[in-house]
């Protein structure tokens, strides 16, 4: 036994405090635990050994006689008393004859108290689990809280009064019994769970250091023996009278027993017990050990070590500063701690205490060791280790080598290799042999371990071998071997795919070939020898290490979770070393991240990654990511696509429609090996030409961001499919097809957003085939063919998603797939990289970092690396969290946004490209809002681009976020505001956008119109009366007639345009393609196409010359058309642009130029005209037939250049009998800017869409249904003025929309009256006969009926005046129609028969008699 502890002491000289910490887990493990849980018995021994320590000198610790002054000789009496007190029980001393003098007995009692405070420390720590109670007791002793100490024989008592407490409530009575320099028992009235409480420690320390201040008395039995009989009787009576309540019952019981005639125990035993005289001679003197408390603490320690208990966080700080580890990470750390840091710490400290007790000859050593043994055995039986191995093979099958046997062979081999390395490295002549042994161990191939514990042990042993190998100096032969292995790693010939990757070997090779001369510890690596190095060693080592980062394992995480966890950690350590070494080399950092984040087999790659690492100068135009707007660039100026990143888009293009394939092309015209980039720039004039009012670009037109979508978890070696460039954005495709990201659909699909379009259980090929990996691509060539009908992709989203498994609860069964453990690991790695860069991962959570240009914080390159790794981890986390789109808070998102604010515009530019699949639209909008307040103009610009990028998901944003995003775009330039407005409008097509938001967008369009047209600022007021009849004609001629959108295979559309004169505006009647089919359309476009018409293959040209058929250029067949075109107001008009149609709503808002209202009137014969293309191209068929009605035979239309519309000299007669008269004023030769006219039409179009949304929402908005001035009143009136500015047809269309969108009868009546005033008050009756006005008036009357019925139910006498005024207004509305008064009289009769009071009816009757319309 002595030999065993001697060996232990030689090898383990220090406690756990001096051993290796494991990522500070032990220091933080009890932050949130209960106070009763033991603290691993830390601090049981003073760190600096002093004269009072057991290992120090042999002196004592007391000041009352223990420390003698130098030069004084200790009396023999004191020496003898001290030895007697330590070795002989006091009972034996009492029986000595002749009796020992009382003074000598007092000295024996004095020396019987322990004199070393380290003993008090040890047993206090042992009882409480830490040295906290001892430290508090020491503070009480130093603050003189011990009062009235008294030692009677071997009993010490005192009163402890803490300074902050008031006696007698805060006074604690403490009693300590001791014998032979050991405390045998202690008690206190504080009620603490452990007997060795703070107050007991304070009293013991007081007795040790101030022994002379303690009143010393002989034992009670000795004092009583000196009393006479009357003195004894007096003593007993006085004692009872002092404490009658406590002592009297006990005293009477004892008297009864003494006076009893029977033989009681008190009468048969000689003598009497004396608590102050110490224990009997037969009792063994031992230190007081609270075994029950100690046993409970050991149980808690073992339970926490074997299975972490759930922790409940009760405050926000705990939620921020701690994150729950996934099971694989927690289990790995739990199994690795005993190997690296002697865990469980508490058990190891208890064993150290046992060793110290044996050293002190403490008799409690054996009982403590017994308690430990029993508890460990019971815990082992209660939680047996998983020692299962693979089942035996079935009969008839070939026996294979047991995995368990191979694992044990591997671990034994590594153990022996580590031992041989330690021994052989001691002598220089054996260094080569040691190197060969170490390399053999690192190159050892093995299968996955049979148990989890062995898996962790093997990984630890490999790291130990690598550490020992790095300490051996290398010669030329060793360096040659290292270079050979590095070359094999770089070429990929060292190992094929295997479960355990040689990452430790790669780490050693990198350390040998590339490690800096001065290591982080300040010393030169022993393996580095400049004499043996060659010029290409560093590059070779770097490429080998990077190749090792890209290696893939062949096992899945579901089968071997800890092996995958260990592989990730080894890759993380290697990548961290690489990034720190090459933190100033941007090209190498890019290679490291490409391999670490697996960008070759996934779509998680930025387009211009290297430009994001600008350290000092602000980002220039070339450094920013593909801009959604900017200056023009030369067409065809492409950067070739590389394997690391996709080529950047050229700024200046609005839609990115270059010579590559566009949306309407058939598959045969687009070869899969097309070399064209999908983002070639447009000519400079593309941004200035007008655009069709019915065409709103999708996400593709706003700039592709397909670069960072980390969703394609494909096979590592599988070649990627060629993509066809731009995705088809035809209206028949589902919503996800038009997006540039496959991860986020623009509207919910079957009850929620689908974050992915593939399942985690799919194989690598099927997964990677549905991902996009090129800039601007939203689907692969295979999926694009399948999505022509619009259902294939939606089916993939729902059916092939999870393969019947719950994604959040299962590890992937396919190798190298995302998992919760992988996401957690990359988050931790990102935080570690940030700390290495000089930043603090926690500061970004609570503070708003400065966004100034001159950033003096962390190393910029490493900071960007940490940001990208964190973003990648967030993508992994979202992949395994199907409900991530509905989250309200995420600490990971807070970290990402905080780092983005610290980094600046570079991080925001990365997010512009890749936030889909990582952040939700509200999170992006919030970040963009925060970044817009920065002082750096580049960051403000990037924030505006980020805000623009989230507007296509406006249905997921609240009005404040959309409003702020619009303001950000408006602060930059008009082009960005225009894109923002189009994005919100496109998002509103599927519903979910508030009408207030759309009205705001309409106002922004009108503001743009004013900026381009130079008109008066009447954005929020009613527009002036419409007298410029040439506006619409010029807009149609300059823009090209609006047309329907068709996908591949759809038939062309034939559009009929009505003639526009200075006097009369005839409603335009648009006929669908089903009535007037035309020839097929050509698909060839030149780079100089109009940026809006280029996206519309079914009408690729704009009419430039409109001539009479007397001078035909290209005669076209003309089909006869009916004279009357009735169009029901509730049905879809034929020829309406599909972008305006909501699939699930019965009403659609379209400009009047696309459809006619239901007016029956004779239409004159229409002569066919010819259309000349805006851009001539040989062989381009022109299927479009435009008919003009009521054109004088002698009149011709001159060439329209898009700048002005000349005066029309013809003045035909009105076409409609009794129809609308011409306006009072005529405007001739009014110049019109087509670009500004586009803005005006867009404002009207969005306003009508807002009116439609208002109708959808109004049915559930009861408080505003019948309000006199609902919030939307001003916006609706403003839209009426805008419609009047455009023309009568637009007013008619507005009336139809207002009848369905407005429910307030008061607002409807105001609209009716204002409409009549704007058109022509003198011909009000003619206007009222129009179907649109008639429908609006009828809706107003119905609303009044509903209002009256509603108010009668909830009417109170206080509301009578308001109700009577409403009746008066209703009568004015009913007077507008011939049958209206009859309906109004019926209402009054119903009101008369109602249950209301007579007073109400009298007031209504009086009002009706005095009514004068």
From Swiss-Prot:
Keyword terms, alphabetized: Cytoplasm, Metal-binding, Phosphoprotein, Ubl conjugation pathway, Zinc, Zinc-finger
The protein's annotated pathway: Protein modification; protein ubiquitination
Tree of life domain: Eukaryota
Positions with biased composition (Low complexity): 759-794
Region spans: Disordered: 45-65, 600-817
GO CC terms in record: Cul2-RING ubiquitin ligase complex; Cul3-RING ubiquitin ligase complex; cytosol
Modified residues (Phosphoserine): 36, 48, 53, 738, 741, 745, 852, 1412
One MF annotation (Gene Ontology) recorded for this entry: zinc ion binding
Role summary: Substrate recognition component of a SCF-like E3 ubiquitin-protein ligase complex that promotes target-directed microRNA degradation (TDMD), a process that mediates degradation of microRNAs (miRNAs). The SCF-like E3 ubiquitin-protein ligase complex acts by catalyzing ubiquitination and subsequent degradation of AGO proteins (AGO1, AGO2, AGO3 and/or AGO4), thereby exposing miRNAs for degradation. Specifically recognizes and binds AGO proteins when they are engaged with a TDMD target.
Designated name of the protein: Zinc finger SWIM domain-containing protein 8
Species classification: Eukaryota, Metazoa, Chordata, Craniata, Vertebrata
Gene name in the database record: ZSWIM8
């Amino acid at each position: 036994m002595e030999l065993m502890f001697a060996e232990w002491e030689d090898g383990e000289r220090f406690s756990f405090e001096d051993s290796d910490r494991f990522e500070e887990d032990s220091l933080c493990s009890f932050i949130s635990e209960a106070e009763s849980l033991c603290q691993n018995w830390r601090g049981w021994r003073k760190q600096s050994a002093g004269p009072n320590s057991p290992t120090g000198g042999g002196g004592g610790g007391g000041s009352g006689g223990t420390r003698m002054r130098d030069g004084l000789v200790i009396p023999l009496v004191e020496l003898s008393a001290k030895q007697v007190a330590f070795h002989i029980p006091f009972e034996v001393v009492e029986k000595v004859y002749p009796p020992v003098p009382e003074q000598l007995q007092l000295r024996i009692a004095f020396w019987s108290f322990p004199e070393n405070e380290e003993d008090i420390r040890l047993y206090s720590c042992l009882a409480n689990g830490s040295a906290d109670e001892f430290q508090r007791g020491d503070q009480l002793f130093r603050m003189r809280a011990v009062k009235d100490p008294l030692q009677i024989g071997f009993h010490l008592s005192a009163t402890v009064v803490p300074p902050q407490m008031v006696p007698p409530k805060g006074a604690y009575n403490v009693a300590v019994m001791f014998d032979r320099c050991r405390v045998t028992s202690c008690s206190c009235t504080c009620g603490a769970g452990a007997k060795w409480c703070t107050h007991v420690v304070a009293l013991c320390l007081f007795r040790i250091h101030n022994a002379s201040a303690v009143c010393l008395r002989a034992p009670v039995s000795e004092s009583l023996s000196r009393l006479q009989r009357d003195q004894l009787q007096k003593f007993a009576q006085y004692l009872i009278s002092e404490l009658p309540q406590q002592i009297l019952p006990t005293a009477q019981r004892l008297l009864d027993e003494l006076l009893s005639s029977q033989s009681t125990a008190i009468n048969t035993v000689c003598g009497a017990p004396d608590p102050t005289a110490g224990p009997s001679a037969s009792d063994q003197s031992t230190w007081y050990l609270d075994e029950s408390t100690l046993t409970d603490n050991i149980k808690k320690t073992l339970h926490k070590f074997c299975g972490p208990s759930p922790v409940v966080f009760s405050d926000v700080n705990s939620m921020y500063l701690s994150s729950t580890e996934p099971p694989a990470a927690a289990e790995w750390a739990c199994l690795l701690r005993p190997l690296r840091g002697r865990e469980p710490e508490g058990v190891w400290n208890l064993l150290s205490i046992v060793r110290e007790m044996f050293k002190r000859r403490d008799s409690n050593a054996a009982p403590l060791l017994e308690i430990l043994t029993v508890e460990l055995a019971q815990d082992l039986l209660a939680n047996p280790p998983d020692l299962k191995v693979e089942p035996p093979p079935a009969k008839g099958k070939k026996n294979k080598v047991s995995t368990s046997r191979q694992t044990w062979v591997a671990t034994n081999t590594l153990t022996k290799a580590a031992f041989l390395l330690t021994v052989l490295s001691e002598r220089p002549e054996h260094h080569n042999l040691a190197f060969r042994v170490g390399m053999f161990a690192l190159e050892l191939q093995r299968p996955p371990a049979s148990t989890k514990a062995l898996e962790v042990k093997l990984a630890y042993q490999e790291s130990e071998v690598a550490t020992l190998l790095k300490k051996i100096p290398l010669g030329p032969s060793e360096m040659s071997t290292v270079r050979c292995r590095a070359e094999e790693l770089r070429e990929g010939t060292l190992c094929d795919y295997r479960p355990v990757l040689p990452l430790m070997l790669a780490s050693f090779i990198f350390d040998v070939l590339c490690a800096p001369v001065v290591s982080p510890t300040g010393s030169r690596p022993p393996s580095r020898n400049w004499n043996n190095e060659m010029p290409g060693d560093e590059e070779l080592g770097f490429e080998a290490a990077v190749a090792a980062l890209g290696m893939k394992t062949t096992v899945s995480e579901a089968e071997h979770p800890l092996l995958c966890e260990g592989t990730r950690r080894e890759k993380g350590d290697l990548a961290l070393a690489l990034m720190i070494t090459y933190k100033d080399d941007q090209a190498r950092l890019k290679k490291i991240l490409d391999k670490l984040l697996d960008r070759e087999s996934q779509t998680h790659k930025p387009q211009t990654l290297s430009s994001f690492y600008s350290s000092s100068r602000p980002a220039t135009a070339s450094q920013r990511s593909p801009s959604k707007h900017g200056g023009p660039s030369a067409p065809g100026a492409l950067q070739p696509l590389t394997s690391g990143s996709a080529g950047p888009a050229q700024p200046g293009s609005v839609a990115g429609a270059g010579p590559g394939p566009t949306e309407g092309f058939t598959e045969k015209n687009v070869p899969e090996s097309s070399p064209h980039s999908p983002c070639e720039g447009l000519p400079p004039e593309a941004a200035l030409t007008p655009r069709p009012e019915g065409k709103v670009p999708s996400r593709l037109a706003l700039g592709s961001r397909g670069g960072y979508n980390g969703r394609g978890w494909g096979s590592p070696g599988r070649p990627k499919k060629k993509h066809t460039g731009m995705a088809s954005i035809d209206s028949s495709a589902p919503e996800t097809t038009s997006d540039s990201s496959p991860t986020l659909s623009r509207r919910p699909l079957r009850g929620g957003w689908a974050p992915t379009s593939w399942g985690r259980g799919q194989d690598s090929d099927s997964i990677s085939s549905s991902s996009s990996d090129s800039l601007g691509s939203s689907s692969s060539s295979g999926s694009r063919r399948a999505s022509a009908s619009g259902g294939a992709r939606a089916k993939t989203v729902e059916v092939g998603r999870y393969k019947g498994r719950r994604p959040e609860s299962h590890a992937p069964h396919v190798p190298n797939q995302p998992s919760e453990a992988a996401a957690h690991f990359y988050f931790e790695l990102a935080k570690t990289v940030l700390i290495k860069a000089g930043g603090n991962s926690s500061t970004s959570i609570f503070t708003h970092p400065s966004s100034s240009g001159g950033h003096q914080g962390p190393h910029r390159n490493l900071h960007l690396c940490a940001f990208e790794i964190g973003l990648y981890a967030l993508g992994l986390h979202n992949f395994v969290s199907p409900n991530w789109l509905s989250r309200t808070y995420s600490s990971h998102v807070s970290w990402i946004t905080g780092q983005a604010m610290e980094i600046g515009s570079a991080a925001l530019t990365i997010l512009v490209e890749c936030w889909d699949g990582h952040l939700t639209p509200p999170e992006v909008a919030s970040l963009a809002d925060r970044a817009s307040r920065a002082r750096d103009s580049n960051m403000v610009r990037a924030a505006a681009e980020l805000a623009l990028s989230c507007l296509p998901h406006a249905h997921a944003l609240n009005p404040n976020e959309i409003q702020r995003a619009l303001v950000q775009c408006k602060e930059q330039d008009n082009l960005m505001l225009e894109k923002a407005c189009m994005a919100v409008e496109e998002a509103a097509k599927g519903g979910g956008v508030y009408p207030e938001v759309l009205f705001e967008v309409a106002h922004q369009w009108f503001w743009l119109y004013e900026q381009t047209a130079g008109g008066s600022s009447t954005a929020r007021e009613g527009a002036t009366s419409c007298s410029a009849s040439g506006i619409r004609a010029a807009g149609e001629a300059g823009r090209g007639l609006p047309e329907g959108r068709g996908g591949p295979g759809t038939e062309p559309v034939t559009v009929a345009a009505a003639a526009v004169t200075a006097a009369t505006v005839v409603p335009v009647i648009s006929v669908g393609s089903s009535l007037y089919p035309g020839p097929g359309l050509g698909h060839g476009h030149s780079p100089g196409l109009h940026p809006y018409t280029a996206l519309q293959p079914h009408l690729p040209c704009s009419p430039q010359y409109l001539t009479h058929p007397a001078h035909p250029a290209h005669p076209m067949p003309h089909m006869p058309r009916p004279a009357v075109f009735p169009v029901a107001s509730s049905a879809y008009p034929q020829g309406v642009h599909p972008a305006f149609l909501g699939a699930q709503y019965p009403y659609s808002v379209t400009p009047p130029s696309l459809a006619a209202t239901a007016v029956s009137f004779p239409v004159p014969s229409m002569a066919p005209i010819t259309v000349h293309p805006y851009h001539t191209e040989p062989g381009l068929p022109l299927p479009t037939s435009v008919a003009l009605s009521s054109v004088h035979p002698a009149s011709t239309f001159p060439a329209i250049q898009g700048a002005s519309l000349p005066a029309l000299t013809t003045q035909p007669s009105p076409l409609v009998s009794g129809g609308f008269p011409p306006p009072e004023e005529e405007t001739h030769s009014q110049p019109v800017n087509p670009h500004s006219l586009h803005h005006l039409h867009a404002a009207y179009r969005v306003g009508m869409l807002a009116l439609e949304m208002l109708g959808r929402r109004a049915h559930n908005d009861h408080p505003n249904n019948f309000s006199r001035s609902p919030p939307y009143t001003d916006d609706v009136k403003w839209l009426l003025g805008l419609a009047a500015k455009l023309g009568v047809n637009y007013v008619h269309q507005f009336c139809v929309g207002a009848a369905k969108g407005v429910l307030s009868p008061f607002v409807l009546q105001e609209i009716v009256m204002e409409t009549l005033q704007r058109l022509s008050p003198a011909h009000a009756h003619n206007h009222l006969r129009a179907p649109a006005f008639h429908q609006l008036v009828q809706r107003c009357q119905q609303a009044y009926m509903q209002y009256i019925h509603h108010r009668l139910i909830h009417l109170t006498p206080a509301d009578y005046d308001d109700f009577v005024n409403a009746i008066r207004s209703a009568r004015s509305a009913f007077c507008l129609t011939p049958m209206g008064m009859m309906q109004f009289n019926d209402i009054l009769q119903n009101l008369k028969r109602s249950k209301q009071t007579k007073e109400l009816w009298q007031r209504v009757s009086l009002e009706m008699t005095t009514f004068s319309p």
